[in-house]
Design a protein with these regions (language model features):
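Active-site beta-loop-alpha junctions enriched in small/polar residues
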Residues: 1-2, 41-47, 72-74, 101-107, ...
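Short connector loops/turns at beta-strand edges and beta->alpha or beta->beta junctions
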Residues: 1-4, 67
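Glycine-rich tight-turn/loop motif centered on a GG-T
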Residues: 3-22, 75-84
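Short glycine/serine/threonine-biased micro-segments
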Residues: 10-12, 43, 100-101, 116
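Active-site mouth loops of central-metabolism enzymes
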Residues: 14-16, 39-52
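Alpha/beta catalytic cores of nucleotide-metabolism and tRNA/nucleoside-modifying enzymes
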Residues: 20, 24-33, 37, 52-66, ...
């Protein structure tokens, strides 16, 4: 976690300042869950993008299911450019499977075989030409999985909230935000189909 309040307490990205604590955490997780079942998600560093690379000899002592690396520092939070060269150095140094996390959009060539889908990918879906079909299918799947309109609407509203920088969705967002049923949502979406 890159948030200052968390890292000041020595948690999340604050573990970059406490490598012995990080190592105890890895040991406990791997011991408790068994080899290859515990995962670590981290940043490239707290302030610099070479800090994780310096910790790789310690991290490599533990058989992780996956090492997920957000290719920014904690200090950057979610702004600035991801450092793909630093990510590649960490991936090359790792004895565990590595998953990329950071800026990545639909259609981009992934910087690693494994990619954690995050906000930037989800945002890019809203601009796709086939978004109406995808969203309709997602509503259907959510209705089959969840019980009632309220949780389905919550899921859809969260998804659509990521798309409000796109003109169509910015225009629809006030209507989507206040709709109370799945059928009402479907009506809003149908009325705006074809990029209207």
């Amino acid at each position: 976690c890159p948030f200052p309040m968390i890292r000041r307490r020595g948690r999340g990205a604050g573990l970059f300042r406490a490598p012995d604590v990080l190592e105890r955490l890895l040991a406990a997780g791997c011991d408790e869950m068994g080899p290859g079942r515990f995962s670590l998600k981290t940043r490239l560093g707290l302030e610099r993008t070479d800090e994780l690379l310096a910790l790789m000899p310690r991290i490599n002592r533990y058989p992780l299911a996956v090492l997920t690396v957000h290719a920014r520092t904690a200090h950057q939070m979610y702004t600035g450019v991801c450092d793909l060269a630093a990510f590649a150095s960490v991936a090359a140094a790792s004895t565990n499977p590595v998953m990329y996390n950071g800026d990545w959009a639909a259609g981009d060539v992934p910087p690693a075989p494994r990619v954690m889908v995050g906000r930037s990918f989800i945002r890019s879906l809203g601009a796709r030409e086939d978004v109406d079909g995808l969203l309709g299918r997602y509503i259907d799947l959510s209705c089959a999985e969840l019980c009632g309109d309220h949780p389905v609407l919550g899921r859809m509203k969260e998804l659509i909230s990521y798309w409000t920088e796109i003109p169509r969705w910015r225009r629809l967002w006030p209507l989507v935000k206040i709709c109370r049923t799945v059928e009402e949502l479907r009506g809003i979406l149908k009325g705006s189909a074809c990029g209207a």
